[in-house]
Structure formats: structure tokens, C-alpha cells
């Protein structure tokens, strides 16, 4: 009998062309399905994720599901997958899920984090894991601006022109930031995120911190529903899909 398996995984997005499978490109989904096909003796197994991540974007807590006829315990699945996956993907947790569980459609909220290193000199070892930003920032102004991001808004100004969904209203439950030595970490929890939304919000908030735009410009951007009213898109390497929230 077929079983539905739910996995939580981490990956370093540096050497992937994103999560979603692309012909001739190295992707997270491609690596997962390659290993599962080997385990199923050549039978193709389709993997479904909570959402896609772009090239260079990392995941601390991505969630996937797939269906299988193999009779392995969750612990056996975890060991078998980790033994065959490349070292930039790690399966952290495996559970047998209810057949109705869906990694994407059962998700109630997602948490993204974005890391910015505020220092004059670049760190060669951190260059793929945070955004190097050598400018002084007004932290108080940025916190005020972040509070305006919280709540239910139309995020048309804060998503890529490539966004292919018509309903761009999302609810952000938490938009916060904290300093850890020279590392500034943004945290966003919401019921859904549009294409490049977190990276555009971060780029905009950094412009507030640098004095390039006012705190009020956040409200104006929401009203305008026009990408040109928000700031630059922050680069991919600072972004992490941190956690996916489900009812259970």
C-alpha cells in the first residue's frame, strides 16, 4: 500500500539553480528525485515542496512530501536518503504523514530569514551566506518601517514583475530584525510570500536605514501597487527559507 512521506530538509543553495527541476541544471528537486528513483529501482518518484527557492537561496527547514510503496521506517528513510544525497542537502526529519497531507497546500505559514553583514571589509567565507553591506544604518528608522510591513496588505509593489499570481494580498504576522555582532538578521512570518517579496522588502528597508527613502515611503508603496515605488531587490545569498508551519 502506498504511504505518504513528509521530510524536513536543509540545503545550501550556492551551487543549485534553485529548488525546482530544470533540464540540464543542478536543482534540489532534481537531486531528491534522482536518489528516490535509485531507491525505487528506476521508478520515477515525484517530490512536492512547500514552495520554490531561487538560485543561491538557502533553506534551513524546507518541507517536501512524496508517495512510496517501500516499507521503510522514518529513521531508515532518513539514513538512506542522507547516505545518497550530495553533501549540500541534509534530511533533518522524516515522518509518515496522513494521505491528505500536502507540503504546499497544507502549509499555514512560512518563516523566512535574511542575513546582512554590516562591515567595511568583505568576509570571503561568508560571501555566499549573507549580504555584505558596508554602510551605516539607522536601526530605529528600520524598525519603524518594518512595523508598517506587518498586517494584511496588497504587496504588488514588493514583488517581482515576473509574479504570475493575480491575488497579491498577503498577511505578515511578524516583521522583525535583530543584530548579532556584525550580522543583522531579518525575520518574516506570513501566510504566504510572492516572488522575490522578502528580498524586495529587505532592499527597501535597507534604503530606509541608509536615509535614501522615508519611513512613509512604505505606506506610499502599498498604495501605489507599482514595483517602481519599492527599493532594490536584495541579492539571493542572504535569504533562508527557515520554517514551514502546519496545523500539527
From Swiss-Prot:
Task: List UniProt keywords, sorted A-Z.
Answer: Isomerase, tRNA processing
- Active-site residues are 54
Pfam name, any one: PseudoU_synth_1
Per UniProt, substrate binds at 112
Q: Which SUPFAM superfamilies match?
A: Pseudouridine synthase
Catalytic activity of the protein: uridine(38/39/40) in tRNA = pseudouridine(38/39/40) in tRNA
Q: Does the keyword Transferase apply?
A: no
One function term, GO molecular function aspect? RNA binding
- Name a biological process GO annotation: tRNA pseudouridine synthesis
Query: Could you tell me the EC number(s) of this protein?
Result: 5.4.99.12
* InterPro entries (UniProt xref): PsdUridine_synth_cat_dom_sf (IPR020103), PsdUridine_synth_TruA (IPR001406), PsdUridine_synth_TruA_a/b_dom (IPR020097), PsdUridine_synth_TruA_C (IPR020095), TruA/RsuA/RluB/E/F_N (IPR020094)
Question: What is its biological role?
Answer: Formation of pseudouridine at positions 38, 39 and 40 in the anticodon stem and loop of transfer RNAs.
Which family does this protein fall into?
Belongs to the tRNA pseudouridine synthase TruA family.
* Record-linked NCBIfam families: hisT_truA
Q: How does it assemble?
A: Homodimer.
The molecule here is called: tRNA pseudouridine synthase A
Q: Species name for this entry?
A: Geobacillus sp. (strain WCH70)
* Taxonomic classification: Bacteria, Bacillati, Bacillota, Bacilli, Bacillales
Amino acid at each position: 500500500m502506498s504511504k505518504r512521506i513528509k521530510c524536513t530538509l536543509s540545503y545550501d543553495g550556492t551551487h543549485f539553480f534553485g529548488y525546482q527541476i530544470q533540464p540540464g541544471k543542478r536543482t534540489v528537486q532534481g537531486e531528491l528525485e534522482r536518489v528516490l528513483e535509485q531507491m525505487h529501482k528506476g521508478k520515477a518518484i515525484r517530490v512536492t515542496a512547500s514552495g520554490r527557492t531561487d538560485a543561491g537561496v538557502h533553506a534551513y527547514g524546507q518541507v517536501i512530501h512524496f508517495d512510496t510503496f517501500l516499507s521503510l521506517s522514518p529513521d531508515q528513510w532518513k539514513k538512506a536518503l542522507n547516505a545518497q544525497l550530495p553533501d549540500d542537502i541534509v534530511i533533518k526529519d522524516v515522518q509518515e504523514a496522513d494521505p491528505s497531507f500536502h507540503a504546499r497546500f497544507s502549509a499555514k505559514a512560512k518563516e523566512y530569514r535574511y542575513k546582512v553583514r554590516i562591515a567595511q571589509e568583505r568576509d570571503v567565507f561568508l560571501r555566499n551566506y549573507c549580504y555584505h553591506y558596508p554602510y551605516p544604518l539607522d536601526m530605529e528608522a528600520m524598525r519603524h518601517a518594518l512595523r508598517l510591513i506587518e498586517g494584511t496588505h496588497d504587496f504588488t509593489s514588493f514583488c517581482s514583475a515576473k509574479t504570475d499570481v493575480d491575488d497579491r494580498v498577503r498577511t505578515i504576522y511578524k516583521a522583525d530584525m535583530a543584530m548579532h555582532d556584525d550580522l543583522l538578521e531579518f525575520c518574516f512570518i506570513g501566510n504566504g510570500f510572492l516572488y522575490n517579496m522578502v528580498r524586495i522588502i529587505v532592499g527597501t528597508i535597507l534604503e530606509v536605514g541608509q536615509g535614501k527613502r522615508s519611513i512613509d515611503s512604505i505606506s506610499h508603496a502599498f498604495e501605489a501597487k507599482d514595483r517602481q515605488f519599492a527599493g532594490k531587490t536584495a541579492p539571493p545569498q542572504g535569504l533562508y527559507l527557515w520554517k514551514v508551519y502546519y496545523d500539527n
